[in-house]
């Protein structure tokens, strides 16, 4: 695992599985969208070798060359997605989850029926353009991490109980149980109904809102890949402050005119100060003044059962490495930890006493990057205790022998928040 490069070049291909007709190709270079397209001969070869394997009942899932990693994945025997990445050391786990998110985004905005029963390829190509903005945000250098962790990116507001109370009252007045408050693609607060949304829509909906151009109000048709992949719902968004939006998931009612501006002003005008306090939480995730050790350059906290996470690289933001490098380091460390050190452990529904005891024992792993000179490089530590997993990026001044103690103390401090 390393931090080489700036993310490399990524090409994403989407093809109709039966015919091999390309539906779209999206690319990024160094974390930014790129116009570069792969030659049709290369696209045909990549799809051809995958189909050749299928005809022999061999599942081709990934391949590596000297400077490129390729991952293939088919969905419902109808759509084939292929991703190529030149990023040094990128993991297959990360690319597989990228493809899952991309297909989820396609279902979210087009619907599963259109993707599994392709009647008109040209029309489908046109319909899929609506998903480009969301898909491109997965390929870029995002400040979010839910695409990789499959957990909802969250922030902790200073006056959470006040916002939660207003959110519940507003939801009841609006006649829906699915309401959330979102800042820069991260959930600030949500109703119980919203938290019960399945994966991947729980991750995709706030990400979609964060990827769209600013707008005072929206009435957006969406499908729920897990909960309602063939029947559309309405996603209503109302901007309270710049980058802070109220999101409602509902059926034919209520009309947008019923919510804006009368109902909106009634519930949220008195809370302008608590709402303004949410604005800096986008990149920071934690309330101002939350006590973090001065060696912490970034952190990722996951609640594995609730499927929520806190992710920030804001502490000591004026020091090296840059925020982009910090995000890349934590992303790479997450894939290493998830695939190697803390893999999923499927088990029977009822656990024995010994298994419950083992689950409560903390597990940790450490990684030190940099030269042998003291005070250079960075330290990474992961600690899992029960249903929570914490990953820390630490400055080179942090002593290696104190990593576990620092991680344990930080996890205990963060536990009441998530």
From Swiss-Prot:
Pfam families assigned: Fuz_longin_1 (PF19036), Fuz_longin_2 (PF19037), Fuz_longin_3 (PF19038)
GO cellular component entries: cilium; cytoplasm; cytoskeleton; extracellular exosome
Cell compartment(s), UniProt: Cytoplasm; Cytoplasm, Cytoskeleton; Cytoplasm, Cytoskeleton, Cilium basal body
InterPro entries on file: FUZ/MON1/HPS1_longin_1 (IPR043972), FUZ/MON1/HPS1_longin_2 (IPR043971), FUZ/MON1/HPS1_longin_3 (IPR043970), Fuzzy (IPR026069)
One GO MF term attached to the UniProt entry: phosphatidylinositol binding
Domain of life: Eukaryota
Coiled-coil portions: none
Transmembrane segments: none
Keywords: Cell projection, Cilium biogenesis/degradation, Cytoplasm, Cytoskeleton, Developmental protein, Protein transport, Transport
Gene Ontology BP term (one): non-motile cilium assembly
Main location class: cytoplasm
Role according to the record: Probable planar cell polarity effector involved in cilium biogenesis. May regulate protein and membrane transport to the cilium. Proposed to function as core component of the CPLANE (ciliogenesis and planar polarity effectors) complex involved in the recruitment of peripheral IFT-A proteins to basal bodies. May regulate the morphogenesis of hair follicles which depends on functional primary cilia. Binds phosphatidylinositol 3-phosphate with highest affinity, followed by phosphatidylinositol 4-phosphate and phosphatidylinositol 5-phosphate.
PANTHER family: INTRACELLULAR TRAFFIC PROTEIN-RELATED, PROTEIN FUZZY HOMOLOG
Assembly and binders: Component of the CPLANE (ciliogenesis and planar polarity effectors) complex, composed of INTU, FUZ and WDPCP. Interacts with CPLANE2. Interacts with CPLANE1.
The family this protein is said to belong to: Belongs to the fuzzy family.
Name assigned to this protein: Protein fuzzy homolog
Species this protein is from: Homo sapiens
Gene name of the record: FUZ
């Amino acid at each position: 695992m390393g931090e080489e490069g700036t993310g490399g070049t990524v090409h994403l291909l989407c093809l109709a599985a039966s015919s091999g007709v390309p539906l779209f190709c999206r690319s990024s270079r160094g974390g930014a969208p790129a116009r570069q397209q792969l030659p049709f001969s290369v696209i045909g070869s990549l799809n051809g070798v995958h189909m050749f394997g299928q005809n022999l009942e061999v599942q081709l899932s990934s391949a590596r060359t000297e400077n490129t990693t390729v991952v293939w994945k088919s969905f419902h025997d109808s759509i084939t997605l292929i991703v190529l990445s030149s990023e040094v050391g990128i993991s297959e786990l990360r690319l597989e989850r990228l493809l899952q998110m991309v297909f989820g985004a396609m279902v979210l905005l087009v619907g599963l029926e259109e993707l599994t029963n392709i009647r008109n390829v040209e029309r489908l190509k046109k319909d899929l353009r609506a998903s480009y903005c969301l898909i491109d945000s997965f390929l870029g250098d995002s400040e979010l991490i839910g695409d990789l962790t499959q957990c909802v990116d969250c922030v902790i507001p200073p006056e959470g109980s006040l916002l939660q109370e207003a959110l519940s009252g507003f939801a009841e007045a609006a006649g829906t149980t699915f309401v959330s408050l979102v800042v820069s693609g991260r959930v600030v607060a949500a109703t119980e109904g919203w938290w019960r949304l399945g994966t991947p829509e729980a991750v995709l909906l706030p990400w979609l809102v964060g990827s769209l151009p600013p707008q005072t109000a929206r009435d957006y048709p969406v499908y729920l890949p897990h909960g309602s992949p063939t029947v559309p719902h309405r996603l209503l968004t109302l901007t309270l402050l710049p980058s802070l939006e109220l999101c409602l998931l509902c059926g034919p009612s209520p009309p947008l005119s019923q919510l804006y501006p009368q109902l909106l002003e009634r519930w949220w005008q008195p809370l302008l100060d608590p709402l303004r306090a949410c604005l800096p939480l986008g990149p920071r995730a934690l309330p101002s003044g939350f006590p973090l050790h001065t060696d912490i350059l970034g952190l990722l906290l996951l609640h594995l059962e609730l499927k929520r996470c806190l992710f920030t690289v804001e502490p000591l933001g004026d020091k090296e490495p840059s925020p982009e490098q910090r995000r890349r380091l934590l992303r790479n460390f997450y894939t290493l930890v998830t695939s190697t050190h803390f893999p999923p452990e499927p088990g029977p529904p009822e656990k024995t006493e010994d298994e419950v005891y083992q689950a409560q024992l903390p597990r940790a792993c450490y990684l030190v990057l940099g030269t042998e000179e003291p005070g250079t490089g960075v330290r990474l530590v992961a600690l899992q205790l029960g249903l929570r997993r914490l990953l820390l990026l630490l400055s080179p001044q942090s002593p290696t022998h104190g990593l576990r103690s620092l991680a344990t103390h930080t996890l205990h401090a963060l536990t009441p928040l998530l």
